C-alpha cells in the first residue's frame, strides 16, 4: 500500500476532470485519501524533485503528447532508483486512430531532438483525414472536429501519435527503463518497467550527431 499518491494534470480545468485546484490535499484517491495535485506539463515536472517517487502510473496520456520521449525522460527523472513505471496507451485498433499509420520510433526521436512543444500541429492534416469520427462520440461534424483540433493546445483531445506494443516498448526502453512485463487488454497496451541507470536515448542522439 502506498503511503501517499500525488497526481499531475496539464491545466486547472479539463474536459475530463472539470475544475482542478493545485494544493497539497486536493488529489483524491482510494476513497478518502488525499495527495498533492500538481498542475504541470507531462514534459516539465519542474516542481517535483529528482528520485521523488517509488512508482509512476501514466494512463492514456502519452498519445496526447507532442513529445513523448521528453515526457518519458522527465518521468524517469522523478522516479527513485529501482522504481517502476506503468505506462498505458490505447491500442490503435480499438480507437478512432485505427485508420492512421503507427508512428515510427525515428519520428519520436526527431521530435525529441527538435524539442517539439505541446503546441505542435504536425499531425493535423493526417488526423483530419484519417480520424474515424464514427468512433468518437464527441467529434461532432467535420467542422466542429476541425475546430476542436485547432484548439488542441488548450483542450488536449488530439492523439499526436499512434502506438503499438513495439513502439511503446522501444520508447520506454530508449528513455532509460527496463521493460518487466507487457499486456494488452480492453483496448489498451500496458507496460511495466523499472528505472535503469543508463539512458540509451542519450547514446542514440550522440550517434546521430556524429
What are these regions (language model features)?
Residues 40-56:
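A short acidic, Gly/Pro-enriched loop at the edge of an enzyme's catalytic core
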Residues 52, 82-83:
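Surface-exposed loop/turn positions
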Residues 54-66:
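A short SAM/SAH-binding and catalytic strip from SAM-dependent methyltransferases
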Residues 1-45:
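Class I SAM-dependent methyltransferase SAM/SAH-binding core
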Residues 65-66, 79-81:
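Helix-to-beta-strand junctions that scaffold the AdoMet/dcAdoMet cofactor pocket
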Residues 29-32, 69-74, 84-207:
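S-adenosyl-L-methionine-dependent methyltransferase catalytic module, highlighting the catalytic core
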Residues 35, 58-61, 158:
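Short, flexible active-site loop motifs that bind/organize anionic cofactors or intermediates
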Residues 44, 63, 94:
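Active-site micro-motifs of SAM-dependent methyltransferase domains
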Amino acid at each position: 500500500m502506498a503511503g501517499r499518491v500525488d497526481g499531475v494534470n496539464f491545466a486547472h480545468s479539463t474536459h475530463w476532470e472539470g475544475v482542478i485546484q493545485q494544493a497539497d490535499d486536493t488529489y483524491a484517491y482510494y476513497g478518502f485519501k488525499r495527495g498533492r495535485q500538481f498542475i504541470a506539463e507531462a514534459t516539465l515536472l519542474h516542481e517535483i524533485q529528482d528520485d521523488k517517487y517509488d512508482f509512476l502510473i501514466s494512463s492514456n496520456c502519452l498519445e496526447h503528447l507532442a513529445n513523448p520521449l521528453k515526457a518519458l525522460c522527465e518521468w524517469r527523472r522523478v522516479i527513485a532508483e529501482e522504481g517502476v513505471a506503468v505506462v498505458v496507451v490505447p491500442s490503435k485498433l480499438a480507437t478512432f486512430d485505427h485508420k492512421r499509420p503507427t508512428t515510427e520510433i525515428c519520428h519520436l526521436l526527431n521530435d525529441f531532438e527538435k524539442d517539439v512543444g505541446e503546441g505542435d500541429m504536425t499531425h493535423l492534416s493526417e488526423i483530419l483525414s484519417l480520424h474515424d469520427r464514427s468512433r468518437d462520440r464527441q467529434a461532432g461534424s467535420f467542422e466542429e472536429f476541425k475546430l476542436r483540433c485547432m484548439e488542441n493546445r488548450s483542450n488536449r483531445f488530439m492523439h499526436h501519435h499512434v502506438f503499438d506494443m513495439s513502439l511503446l516498448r522501444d520508447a520506454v526502453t530508449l528513455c532509460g527503463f527496463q521493460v518487466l512485463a507487457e499486456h494488452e487488454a480492453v483496448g489498451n497496451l500496458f507496460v511495466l518497467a523499472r528505472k535503469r541507470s543508463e539512458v540509451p536515448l542519450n547514446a542514440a542522439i550522440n550517434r546521430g550527431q556524429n
